[in-house]
Amino acid sequence: KGIYLGPLRLLALEVYEKMRESGVPCTMLTGEERIYEENSRVISSTVEMLDIDQVYDVAVIDEAQMIADSDRGHSWTRGIQCPEIHICMSPAAQKVVTHLIELCGDTFEIRSYERKTALVCEEEPFDFPDEVRAGDALIVFTKRAVLDIAGRLERQGIRTSVIYGSLPPEIRRRQIRMFSAGETRVVVSTDAIGMGLNLPVRR
């Protein structure tokens, strides 16, 4: 029995869909959506949905640097009954997380991974909308701004996907699929897209 725990509905959805594509029955649990699969031994969930009374064989806890978040950080400190736990985080969280493990009297092994693609900063200012290219992700901070920018791009004939927190789950899934498949050229999103979500963003 396994469980994936992440900070975002979008991440839980991504893992759920990858499991299903691999032929693994998977249940998805988030604050707004529950999808139960028959004979499922795997759960993909937002971290707050963890049932601490359940026992698991293996667990993946993602984006554990969120432990420093003043509103949600406590959710990454709850105990999970599991002999093998994989905790994914940025290096900044390593000291805090390993200290908690030691307080519990448990052991750990650290594995570090390097980013496969280099992050490159643009040297010149970005001119919107003239310099928008296929594969771009435009990040804004409100739903209103997402819809405004997407509307401006669509009026110029640029097919656009939109992602923001309150988007209904089925529509959100469709928007992600369309961008991943190249059916839309650009994605406009709130900053939630930046936390672990795997999309074919070029810039």
What are these regions (language model features)?
Residues 1-2, 6, 10-43, 48-60, ...:
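Helicase motor core with emphasis on the C-terminal RecA-like subdomain
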